[in-house]
Amino acid sequence: MSDRISIIGGGSWGTAIAYLLAINGKKVLMYVRDNNQKDSINKKRVNNKYFPDHQLPEGIEATTDIKEVVSFSNIVFLAVPTHATRAVMKKINHLLNEEQILVSTAKGIEEVNFLRNSQIIKEYCNNKIAVLSGPTHAEEVIDGLPTAVVVASRDKEVAESIQDIMMSSTFRVYTNPDVVGVEMGGAVKNIIAVAAGIADGLGYGDNTMAALITRGLHEMSRLGVHFGGKLLTFAGLAGMGDLVVTCTSNHSRNRRFGIKVGKGMNTEEALSSVNQVVEGVRTTRAVYDWYQGKKLNFELPITSQIYQVLFNDKNPLDAVNELMLRGPKHEIEEVVDDVNW
């Protein structure tokens, strides 16, 4: 078990992870890009950009030297958005030693190559990789509210080592070998959360939200299983758990973005208004572009309509109408096949 932890990324989630680990007695070094942010953390014990009202433990220090943070420990958390992962790996791949574990925390899919975060990381190193996911709003983690997550790795010892350093009375960590399922759940749920926000913005009710979450889970699991994920993973924290919290919480950037679109803003206006990374926008485009022209045994109707709303200025009301008037379907084909109905 390591007593020193490196975190690349000084955003809300990187700060929450640092806070949690420091409370657990670890020495944490965070890489941030801004000198003012570094000085605020080191001198005032506050991340002035993301958590100005939260005092950080003494065990946390910040640096703008990425070499320093990579060499600080044998466990390196990558707390950056998916679209920044490749650039970070280009900077650090030659600094890594073979003993270091990389922990991916992003929930997205790279647009051009349709790669999960762990796949991007693997292009640059042979290090062991873990993926952290689940229903986690940084604001609640740093407030000490009970939270449960999942850490996935193909190496059981790696998963358990991350579980060991993060577990606390307010933060419960489960392990799972299904890296594909955990990453796909974390990424694709953002699309459904945008849809949920749009539904809220249009003034729809609880029935609509329940339908979106349930049929959204269907899309998530179908897509994830297609790429090799395990179906039951989508019933867990990285699937249903993350989907529920992201579709219903006011902390959710994807939901807040969707609400603004539902109330009439276009994509650029809504992104500017949220003023934070909204992974669901890029993920919608990545999944839709991959999906086009493929002959598959499943459909992605919600994803397809959200793409049209975000990138082709389709009226959200028309998108809802088309979803509701799709041809009749069985709810779950496997059940029909199983009973020979």
UniProtKB/Swiss-Prot annotation:
Alphabetized SUPFAM superfamilies for the sequence: 6-phosphogluconate dehydrogenase C-terminal domain-like, NAD(P)-binding Rossmann-fold domains
Transmembrane segments: none
Annotated signal sequence range: none
Catalytic reactions of this protein: sn-glycerol 3-phosphate + NAD(+) = dihydroxyacetone phosphate + NADH + H(+); sn-glycerol 3-phosphate + NADP(+) = dihydroxyacetone phosphate + NADPH + H(+)
Active site: K189 (proton acceptor)
GO BP of this protein: carbohydrate metabolic process; glycerol-3-phosphate biosynthetic process; glycerol-3-phosphate catabolic process; glycerophospholipid metabolic process; phospholipid biosynthetic process
GO molecular-function terms, A-Z: glycerol-3-phosphate dehydrogenase [NAD(P)+] activity; NAD binding
Cellular compartments per GO CC: cytosol
Binding-site residues, sn-glycerol 3-phosphate: K107, G134, T136, K189, D242, S252, R253, N254
Organism domain of life: Bacteria
Lipid metabolism as UniProt keyword: yes
UniProt keyword Lipid biosynthesis present: yes
Family matches, as NCBIfam families: PRK00094.1-2 (NF000940), PRK00094.1-3 (NF000941), PRK00094.1-4 (NF000942)
Functional note: Catalyzes the reduction of the glycolytic intermediate dihydroxyacetone phosphate (DHAP) to sn-glycerol 3-phosphate (G3P), the key precursor for phospholipid synthesis.
Protein's name in the database: Glycerol-3-phosphate dehydrogenase [NAD(P)+]
Gene behind this protein: gpsA
